[in-house]
Amino acid sequence: MNPSTAQAHAVVDELIRGGVRDVVLCPGSRNAPLAFALHDADKAGRLRLHVRIDERTAGFLAVGLAAASGSPVPVAMTSGTAVANLGPAVVEANYARVPLIVLSANRPYELLGTGANQTMEQLGYFGTQVRAAISIGLAEEGSEKIEAQNPHWRSATCRVLAAAKGSRTANAGPVQFDIPLREPLVPDRDGGPIPAGRPGGAPWTYTPDVTFDEPVEIDLTADTVVIAGHGAATHPNLSMLPTVAEPTAPQPDNPVHPLALTLLHPQQVIMLGRPTLHRQVSSLLADSRIPVYALTTGPRWPDVSGNSQATGTRAVTSGSPDPAWLQRCAHAHHKALDAVRGQLSTHPLTTGLHVAAHVCGSLRDGDQLVLGASNPVRDAALVPWGAKDVRVRSNRGVAGIDGTVSTAIGAALAHRGGRTVALIGDLTFVHDSSGLLIGPTEPRPENLTIVVSNDNGGGIFELLEQGDPRFHDVSSRIFGTPHDVDIAALCRAYHVDSQSISVEELGPALDEPARGIRVLEVKADRSTLRELHAAIRAAL
């Protein structure tokens, strides 16, 4: 067995021993040893291989797989710009704490700076965005040297996995594993044994997950509201408290609508995870008169306003909430929900908020919901839901719209045996439409419905400062960015079934049995979004 083939097989074997079950592969010459090793493992049923031609979408496919499965997912690619195309997915994985592994093949390091083809300084390319950038030396010729190097290859692979999973830090995230490979890049005719790992399929270096436990004492006799953001953990001893939960947070037992915060005057706040969606929440967290306790699952905690009084991982509570406070919060919550329902029913045009209401109202227990990071995740936070036991995903690490179709496909591939619904805007869909390109030999989601709320542009800007009517003539072009893309034709190009339906038809369409991937397009209006949201606030 030639050195590069032996090295690649040892690395792939050790990844599998460390818990990797899905790998995304992009074609190339320099990463051929890894490609052959991954194909062999896929054929043997040891992992599931997903081949993609575009490294950017491949990265977000891996983000979806890793976020939904909780396991590290490598993306293997050749050298050069192939590596650079992982940049957006790496940044998202960093801030969302997703265990993504960039498995980058490289030229031998002596070729750096020589003008060699498809060669760049790619080790360390991602800088501070990765938990670690790890490399291993070139494999050397000869069976004795291969046996001598095998422990180093396997040990480095275990180090990569530990960094990606946050085993020693409680801070999962992306890692670059850069492997220089020398020719020959294809297996020998006579083959040979793979360098052996530990007996019984054990990893070369076992790294137990760290226990990160920082208790914080909190007295609940003060009027308390919980703000649960992206990445929030479940805290059973806080379940009785009024909770404003973003869609990606665990759904609360005692919910408070985000718009209801303007009707309430809490005396303290317990912040779980990283809230990013609502201006009412941001204003509350910035109020220096109100103590804020930040509870997170890792070493970092959000504190945009610098107002957190204490941080930790769990609350040690004393006292009980005032029943009158709980009643006021419940009343405000229902008043806000009634305001949303009432204005949706009387508004003359279909908006993205209407589409979100029909999608969320059609959800069933056991579903997985993927939300676009722009208006859809915000809309889903405002409307009533039809089920509580729903797994919700959204790329809220850095909240970009790029890669959302690929993320949804990855999440659906990891959500076996259940239904996945994705709600995204038209710009988000068009931006990552190449994520629909799945080869005929590749695994496909069993049941993924992508609902495209199509208002022909960027509806979120209608609700921001740029959407002020005095800027209409300018903003409609440079922020609204109408595109006139034929969604149905785009789907046909990728052999994906699609329908264009009304919002009233959306619920029944979602209830229909579905296989594979389908797209439901609902035409919406964004010109009256500002008016609709103002009417909802006025109804409070």
Swiss-Prot record:
GO-annotated biological processes: menaquinone biosynthetic process
Catalytic activity: isochorismate + 2-oxoglutarate + H(+) = 5-enolpyruvoyl-6-hydroxy-2-succinyl-cyclohex-3-ene-1-carboxylate + CO2
Pathway note: Quinol/quinone metabolism; 1,4-dihydroxy-2-naphthoate biosynthesis; 1,4-dihydroxy-2-naphthoate from chorismate: step 2/7; Quinol/quinone metabolism; menaquinone biosynthesis
Bound cofactor: record note: Binds 1 thiamine pyrophosphate per subunit.
Record key words, sorted: Magnesium, Manganese, Menaquinone biosynthesis, Metal-binding, Thiamine pyrophosphate, Transferase
Cofactor: Mg(2+); Mn(2+); thiamine diphosphate
Entry EC number(s): 2.2.1.9
InterPro entries, alphabetized: MenaQ_synth_MenD, THDP-binding, Thiamin_PyroP_enz_TPP-bd_dom, TPP_enzyme_TPP-bd
GO molecular function: 2-succinyl-5-enolpyruvyl-6-hydroxy-3-cyclohexene-1-carboxylic-acid synthase activity; magnesium ion binding; manganese ion binding; thiamine pyrophosphate binding
PANTHER family xref list: 2-SUCCINYL-5-ENOLPYRUVYL-6-HYDROXY-3-CYCLOHEXENE-1-CARBOXYLATE SYNTHASE, PROTEIN PHYLLO, CHLOROPLASTIC
Quaternary state and interactors: Homodimer.
Protein family membership: Belongs to the TPP enzyme family. MenD subfamily.
This protein's name: 2-succinyl-5-enolpyruvyl-6-hydroxy-3-cyclohexene-1-carboxylate synthase
Organism: Mycobacteroides abscessus (strain ATCC 19977 / DSM 44196 / CCUG 20993 / CIP 104536 / JCM 13569 / NCTC 13031 / TMC 1543 / L948)
